[in-house]
From Swiss-Prot:
Keyword Kinase: no
Record lineage: Eukaryota, Viridiplantae, Streptophyta, Embryophyta, Tracheophyta
E.C. number: 7.1.1.-
GO molecular function, one term: quinone binding
InterPro entries: NADH-Q_OxRdtase_suN/2, ND/Mrp_TM, Ndh2_N
PANTHER family given in the database record: NADH DEHYDROGENASE
Entry similarity comment: Belongs to the complex I subunit 2 family.
Localization of this protein: Plastid, Chloroplast thylakoid membrane
Top-level taxon of the source organism: Eukaryota
Keyword Transmembrane helix among UniProt keywords: yes
GO biological process: ATP synthesis coupled electron transport; photosynthesis, light reaction
Principal localisation: plastid
Protein's name according to its UniProt entry: NAD(P)H-quinone oxidoreductase subunit 2 A, chloroplastic
Length: 510
């Protein structure tokens, strides 16, 4: 009899949970329509892969790319709608979150065609690769709109788990396995530190988990200037620093970049930074509103360390991917300037604008590396010597992307950095901007060193890799070249395109 009653109670509880979930999805689901499109694409991929004996690879790519493009379209149609807090306060939709979601979708859309030829040549499993990419994209999108501590923790874990699986996708590669283990262990440690910081924030606010309610809770408990908040700030900064590859939490980055498949590195190098930057901006700006001086100081120190260490160590690298790893550490230091400046002096607009340009510059560079690696099998910087004599198109594309990363005019990277540094200067961050300018000059040195190798390699310096290089004709169906051309064009757009981009970015208020 007791068992029968308990069983009935369990059924009733399960029914209530199901009805509540159905109610939330029915009334709030329209606000996450772009995410629902990706979920539908994931289910469709799984169904086709499970039921079909013959793997129609072009069809898998088509479904993935179409899902991403449709999600972007749905996101654009939702632009300028009223901000909404949905799913019982777990998720928020506004222009600020949606522009970061757009950037993540743009990254994934460009990364899929960049991966096609690489996966075919390495004989990697295509379905799982696309599933991990779409799931990571979904996790990044939910992180951008996360409005409570639980979602802010669960969403990046979804992204991180897919990142671990993608970085170790070439199971027979010893370097890939080593990189995955380091990434997994350090990622787990950083997540633990982040959760510990959240627990201090949760306790200090009187048990609140929503970001805005945490602020109200801190006011009610009079704990907004307590040591507990400073401890929470310290732990959360360390956890976010790992996600952003900020020094000194950057040790995993070079090994993961070098050991992972190159298309995976291209994907992780941009999407992780976009999602983590969106989350960091909201975490620091809302719950730590009363500790703005403290987190400004912390981020300034981390930004200076990242810009100096990243660019100085990049000079000594012999691997293209390791060089880009240290370069990305320096680049995220520039992005931090926009987060510190905030919305009052156009900091968020400059950060978003620079991130848009960084996506095109970085993915364009990685597209060139993927193409060169497939044709030569090497990643060493010295092996690029004299590439211009064999493949002028690839050499010029790589040179333009590197010059844009360095911030030379009249390329997009120059105007992005100029606007970012100008906003920092207006906000009074004179020392931070000066360090940024100095390290930008240092970065130009190692980028120009590579370009000199590309263009002026003498016959005796040309390695067998380039000497035996066979340039395939430019084909309309070469997806890597398609991604490369799109990124190169976006990286070389002059300042004439800046005004509309900045105008759109300035609308991204909370």
């Amino acid at each position: 009899m007791i068992w029968h009653v308990q069983n009935e109670n369990l059924i009733l509880d399960s029914t209530r949970i199901f009805m509540k979930a159905f109610h939330l999805l029915l009334f709030d689901g329209s606000f996450i329509f772009p995410e629902c499109i990706l979920i539908f694409g994931l289910i469709l991929l799984l169904m086709i892969d499970s039921t079909s004996d013959q793997k129609d690879i072009p069809w898998f790519y088509f479904i993935s790319s179409t899902s991403l493009v449709m999600s972007i379209t749905a996101l654009l149609f939702r632009w300028r709608e009223e901000p909404m807090i949905i799913f019982s306060g777990n998720f928020q939709t506004n222009n600020f979150n949606e522009i970061f979601q757009f950037l993540i979708l743009l990254c994934s859309t460009l990364c899929i065609p960049l991966s096609v030829e690489y996966i075919e040549c390495t004989e990697m499993a295509i379905t799982e690769f696309l599933l991990f990419v779409l799931t990571a994209t979904l996790g990044g999108m939910f992180l951008c709109g996360a409005n409570d501590l639980i979602t802010i923790f669960v969403a990046p874990e979804c992204f991180s788990l897919c990142s671990y699986l993608l970085s170790g996708y070439t199971k027979k590669d010893v370097r890939s396995n080593e990189a995955t283990m380091k990434y997994l262990l350090m990622g787990g440690a950083s997540s633990s530190i982040l959760v510990h910081g959240f627990s201090w924030l949760y306790g200090s606010s009187g048990g609140e988990i929503e970001l805005q309610e945490i602020v109200n809770g801190l006011i009610n408990t009079q704990m907004y200037n307590s040591p507990g908040i400073l401890i929470a700030l310290l732990f959360i900064t360390v956890g976010i620093g790992f996600k952003l590859s900020l020094a000194p939490s950057h040790q995993w980055t070079p090994d993961v970049y070098e050991g992972s498949p190159t298309p995976v590195v291209a994907f992780l190098s941009v999407t992780s930074k976009v999602a983590a930057s969106a989350s960091a901006t909201r975490i620091f700006d809302i719950p730590f509103y009363f500790s703005s001086n403290e987190w400004h100081l912390l981020l300034e120190i981390l930004a200076i360390l990242s810009m100096i260490l990243g660019n100085l160590i990049a000079i000594t690298q012999t691997s293209m991917k390791r060089m880009l790893a240290y370069s990305s550490i320096g680049q995220i230091g520039y992005v931090i300037i926009g987060i510190i400046v905030g919305d009052s002096n156009g900091g968020y607009a400059s950060m978003i604008t620079y991130m848009l340009f960084y996506i095109s510059m970085n993915l364009g560079t990685f597209a060139c590396i993927v193409l060169f690696g497939l044709r030569t099998g090497t990643d060493n910087i010295r092996d690029y010597a004299g590439l211009y004599t064999k493949d002028p198109f690839l050499a010029l594309s790589l040179a333009l992307c590197l010059l844009s990363l360095g911030g030379l005019p009249p390329l997009a990277g120059f105007f992005g950095k100029l606007h970012l540094f100008w906003c920092g200067w207006q906000a009074g961050l004179y020392f931070l901007v000066s360090i940024g300018l100095l390290t930008s000059v240092i970065s130009i040195y190692y980028y120009l060193k590579i370009i000199k190798l590309l263009m002026t390699g003498r016959n005796q310096e040309i390695t067998p890799h380039v000497r035996n290089y066979r340039r395939s004709p430019l084909r309309s169906n070469n997806s890597i070249e398609l991604s490369m051309i799109v990124c190169v064009i976006a990286s070389t757009i002059p300042g004439i395109s800046m005004n509309p981009i900045i105008a759109i970015a300035q609308d991204t208020l909370f």
